[in-house]
């Protein structure tokens, strides 16, 4: 039997609590008072590690001297604990349930979410070449691309000697020739930001995923649903651009970032204006459709990665949502794939976890990442100082310490062996990079629920993962993983 109190102030004192057990439960965090006012509290309320406090004598009445307990107040339910009483303010949505007469116990249940959830929405106008909101499911992941001029500038700087940065330039030209608005080098105006979706990039790199059936179904559905004769060409050329970016060390994660989760849209001809949930609970945002007022985050099944399952970790507890790029850097076999990963590990530990799972790719990139890079051919311009050879050769130029520290030290230095390091062809941080990840949200639930089911998409059944209770909002900072 339960009752809903209407008062906004509730006090439990010693006479009320003597000989009874009272538990305040809310999302597995509680205050429990037993015989003699023996109390335990958990960090959900007081911000401390759980400990036992004896407010009164445990076995001998209320006349003995109690131990002083400083007042404590929570941020969620405004509970004040003193040596004489427990005061609960704002009693809205709090239930008091007596369990039985033989075992007197009162349970006060706090609502799981007694705070206002704020959701931040974001809008973007874009062409529909890489993303059609009328085709995608509401709640799908939307990504935003930087301008192609930024990629070309980075390619001219970061491409190693021996590799051609014009490969990326040619790939971008071919890609935008198959789009609605062709782009030329040096053009800075026009629509600067393109948006795309997680399912579109997964369709581009369908051959990279281990779940071949789900990846092929997603690609076929994308081509069929978009209904454009050049859609297959766009997917192929977008994939070639991603491979060229890896070859030139202009990694895609530096130019593709998380935008939000699709909520609403307007579309006309080849332009669309989308509204996405950028921060806050996904289910808290409402759509203008009466049939689906609330939407749940969903992704293609081929891109989903349960890292905790692969690491044999516990499936319970809060989960972090990461966006992960995985790179293969072998010459002419460059690979890119994008995952949405779930893990209870934080940002620091997550990198070590995927480094363990991607050990083979990490080793291959370190061994083969410098293929095609120009090596040095100058015999007197070596990578390392030949100290042993110079010491064993009696004819090598030498000078005393006095000459080096004297007035004419510059003349003495010119007589010595001139060495300049040349590190071309050696592995670098960029050539060894195998992954990059960023935190984009959390699932703050004790029991995380995700469901895999078949969804109708473009006339085809596509395996889809639905994530419940996602709260978007991360650092939007990419962490790069290299050997």
Swiss-Prot record:
InterPro entries: Herpes_1. One of its GO terms (cellular component) is host cell nucleus. Its main location: virion. One of its GO terms (biological process) is symbiont-mediated suppression of host apoptosis. It comes from the Viruses. Signal peptide: none annotated. One of its GO terms (molecular function) is DNA binding. It is found in: Virion; Host nucleus. A motif (RIP homotypic interaction motif (RHIM)) lies at residues 24-40. The keyword Ribonucleoprotein does not apply. Pfam families: Herpes_VP19C. Keywords: Capsid protein, Host nucleus, Host-virus interaction, Inhibition of host caspases by virus, Modulation of host cell apoptosis by virus, Virion. Interacts with TRX2, MCP and capsid vertex component 2/CVC2. Self-assembles into homo-oligomeric amyloid fibrils. Interacts with host ZBP1; this interaction prevents host necroptosis and extrinsic apoptosis. Interacts with host RIPK3. HAMAP family: HSV_TRX1. Belongs to the herpesviridae TRX1 protein family. Structural component of the T=16 icosahedral capsid. The capsid is composed of pentamers and hexamers of major capsid protein/MCP, which are linked together by heterotrimers called triplexes. These triplexes are formed by a single molecule of triplex protein 1/TRX1 and two copies of triplex protein 2/TRX2. Additionally, TRX1 is required for efficient transport of TRX2 to the nucleus, which is the site of capsid assembly. Also prevents necroptosis and extrinsic apoptosis by sequestering host ZBP1 into large, insoluble supercomplexes and impairing its ability to interact with RIPK3. This is Triplex capsid protein 1.
């Amino acid at each position: 039997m339960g009752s809903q109190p209407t008062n906004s102030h509730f006090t439990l004192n010693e006479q009320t609590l003597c000989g009874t057990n009272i538990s305040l439960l809310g999302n597995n965090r509680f205050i429990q008072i037993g015989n003699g006012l023996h109390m335990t509290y958990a960090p959900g309320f007081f911000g401390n590690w759980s400990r036992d406090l004896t407010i009164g004598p445990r076995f001998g009445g209320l006349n003995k001297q109690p131990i002083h307990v400083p007042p404590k107040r929570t941020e969620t339910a405004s509970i004040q604990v003193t040596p004489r009483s427990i005061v609960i303010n704002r009693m809205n949505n709090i239930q008091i349930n007596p369990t039985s007469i033989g075992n007197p116990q009162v349970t006060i249940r706090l609502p799981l979410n007694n705070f206002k959830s704020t959701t931040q929405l974001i809008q973007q106008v874009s062409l529909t070449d890489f993303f059609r909101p009328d085709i995608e499911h509401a709640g799908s992941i939307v990504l935003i691309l930087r301008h192609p001029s930024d990629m070309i500038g980075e390619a001219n700087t970061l491409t190693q000697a021996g590799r051609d940065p014009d490969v990326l330039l040619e790939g971008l030209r071919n890609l935008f020739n198959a789009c609605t608005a062709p782009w030329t080098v040096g053009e800075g105006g026009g629509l600067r930001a393109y948006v795309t979706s997680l399912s579109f990039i997964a369709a581009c790199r369908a051959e990279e995923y281990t779940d071949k059936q789900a990846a092929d179904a997603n690609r076929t559905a994308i081509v069929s649903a978009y209904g454009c004769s050049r859609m297959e060409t766009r997917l192929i050329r977008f994939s070639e651009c991603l491979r060229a970016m890896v070859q030139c060390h202009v990694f895609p994660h530096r130019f593709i970032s998380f935008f939000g989760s699709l909520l609403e849209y307007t579309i006309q001809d080849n332009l669309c204006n989308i509204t996405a949930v950028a921060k806050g609970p996904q289910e808290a945002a409402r759509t203008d459709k009466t049939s689906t007022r609330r939407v749940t985050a969903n992704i293609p099944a081929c891109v989903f990665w349960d890292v905790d399952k692969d690491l044999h970790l516990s499936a319970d507890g809060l989960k972090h949502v990461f966006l992960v790029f995985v790179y293969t850097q072998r010459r002419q076999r460059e690979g890119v794939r994008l995952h949405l990963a779930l893990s209870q590990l934080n940002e620091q530990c997550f990198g070590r976890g995927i480094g363990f799972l991607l050990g083979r790719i990490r080793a291959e990139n370190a061994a083969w990442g410098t293929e095609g890079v120009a090596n040095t051919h100058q015999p007197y311009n070596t990578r390392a100082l030949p100290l042993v050879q110079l010491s064993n050769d009696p004819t090598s130029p030498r000078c005393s310490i006095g000459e080096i520290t004297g007035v004419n030290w510059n003349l003495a230095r010119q007589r010595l062996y001139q060495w300049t390091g040349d590190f071309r062809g050696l592995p670098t941080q960029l050539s060894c990079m195998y992954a990059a990840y960023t935190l984009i949200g959390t699932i703050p639930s004790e029991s995380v629920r995700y469901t895999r089911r078949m969804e109708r998409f473009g006339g085809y059944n596509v395996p889809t993962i639905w994530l419940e209770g996602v709260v978007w909002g991360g650092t939007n900072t990419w962490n790069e993983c290299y050997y």
